[in-house]
Curated annotation (Swiss-Prot):
Protein name from the UniProt record: Beta-phenylalanine transaminase
Spans through the membrane: none
Activity regulation note: Is inhibited by 2-aminooxyacetate (AOA), a mimic of beta-alanine and a known inhibitor of aminotransferases.
pH sensitivity of activity: Has high activity over a broad pH range (4 to 11.2).
Amino acid sequence: MTHAAIDQALADAYRRFTDANPASQRQFEAQARYMPGANSRSVLFYAPFPLTIARGEGAALWDADGHRYADFIAEYTAGVYGHSAPEIRDAVIEAMQGGINLTGHNLLEGRLARLICERFPQIEQLRFTNSGTEANLMALTAALHFTGRRKIVVFSGGYHGGVLGFGARPSPTTVPFDFLVLPYNDAQTARAQIERHGPEIAVVLVEPMQGASGCIPGQPDFLQALRESATQVGALLVFDEVMTSRLAPHGLANKLGIRSDLTTLGKYIGGGMSFGAFGGRADVMALFDPRTGPLAHSGTFNNNVMTMAAGYAGLTKLFTPEAAGALAERGEALRARLNALCANEGVAMQFTGIGSLMNAHFVQGDVRSSEDLAAVDGRLRQLLFFHLLNEDIYSSPRGFVVLSLPLTDADIDRYVAAIGSFIGGHGALLPRAN
């Protein structure tokens, strides 16, 4: 494997992509006149230019040039229902017919709140927001006020929204709270540092599985250590389940048997509409009770009828607890097939994750934190992405794989075959297993 060979392979991939997608390129160039980088969502950009997606149906997408793809990214986990599910579309239309901007409590929000609290037992009460980012910000605000402390424990590689990122390089857009950043999946260090800073710590915020860093599962002993340490020092524990709530019938934390003080939700729970929620212990959430509590929480679209209707329809008619369990089992089976394929081909490539979420990594051995991926050549992930596009599979440049309900067995077989052809076609460029 040489750097020059990988560069050449990537240049060839760029050229084929550009030749095949003139309409997307024109759209990108026209849009860039009015939007910086033609973009309002950074994760969607990739060189030489991103595809313009024209429409979706079921588990299929069509781009501006008419190419059809099997969708294996599913709106970065928000699209668990696929595209244009009739049950959700009908619910949204019915809600709109009753009026969109009602400027008041409405008939739909209470039933969705009850459904979520019943689905996720650790949530006694909740409030709606417009995104997972907002949900995490409000959960942190609640913890700071409830404890009267200022320090927030987070973990390297963590991502809790557009203004709460803790990757390898500090993000200038991260809000300026007093953060203590600790290594992920290191129970010993977490216990020691939380005990050391205990009187200052208001809250410990963690993903039970880190999503943006590459589907890195939190080890049960690590998550349990956070629960015990937070309790010991009088801090709150917040599980960010914006992504992971879909990984088990009642959320990943419930499956692990670890109860947080607050939980944040987002993505798919709004039925594909803008959605977020935070909730948990009733005594903490009472801070936001406008009759007695000291904290205000506003947002014009927090309880918008389209999200309230779509969310309820999705959770009752499509992504039931039984459906969540079945989708997780499909994901486990797929990941096992992919890892067996990589092992049989002798390449240092693996898929980490839980259930219906997984990520490709060009590395051998256990992946317990983002530090274990620091030496991975990012160009290989790009090669994989463009290879999958050539195989009519839409995925993520970072190797993220997301299953949705409408994906068929044939779609999944095609994905496995595409990974096999990628290894076969680029094997000389890939690291070999020891």
